[in-house]
């Protein structure tokens, strides 16, 4: 009976360690983001591009038209969560792996306690 319990716990331990590794293996790699202060790349053969028209100030047209503020029930309708295609970031993956390792340690401690209890009686 104890060997069957130990075999089950070992199988649970192995599956707890391997499941996060298998599930996080197929995450696509995202391109490296550029820094905000890096200069923009210019097309080959062209000089710097002027971003503003010389000598012209924007004309003030007055205050903007008032808009209807959304009610409290409409505040979440405009927000779109997780538009990145459903992939997890590196922090979330690390948290999942750490949680799996902690769960494995708890299961291992329970196995040790159970084996000591049954071997003592």
From Swiss-Prot:
Membrane topology: Single-pass membrane protein
Start and end residues of each stretch annotated as Disordered: 28-84
GO cellular component: cell periphery; cytoplasm; extracellular region; membrane
Annotated compartments: Membrane; Cytoplasm; Secreted, Extracellular space, Extracellular matrix
Tissue: Expressed in cartilage.
Main subcellular localisation: membrane
InterPro entries on file: SNORC
UniProt topological domain (Extracellular) ranges: 25-92
Record's protein name: Protein SNORC
